[in-house]
């Protein structure tokens, strides 16, 4: 089962109703991490109790939450939909996560393949958010607040902007029943969201870039 929202690392500037929101690099990925934590604890522990193997990832244009299970599918569906549908953030939990994600950022800084991709994007684009690493930087994620995360949830974590897909030993009726149980079938007004894009010249930002890394 995979539950995905059309919200990724490049969605950093948008208008939510009458409010303009400008995000630092790395918010979508940071939010992905925080979705697994609520007032009751860790969603990974809940998935473990149902026997499911859960994971998630953030890309430039989407965030996806997924699990694989051979039994207790209903229980795992409830865990997935509840954790995504009922976010919980505090400054204390955000401060804790900043250190964890900071280590992940440093790990990717040591990846030649990933540095090549980000370096290429920096050469191609002048100001488009795709220039920034999906995880952001240690400095950018240090500015993340609960309000930012709640704004992102309100704008992009709504049924009209999400897709739920399932494959395997299940039925459409079982999946729809889970959506019904967790309130996804209830009519709700769609938020007025407008993505704001920066003007991007038709020329490359740089013709070349040199990255030097230590050899292990």
Language-model features: locations:
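Acidic/histidine-enriched segments that form metal/cofactor-coordinating
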Residues: 39-152, 173, 197, 201
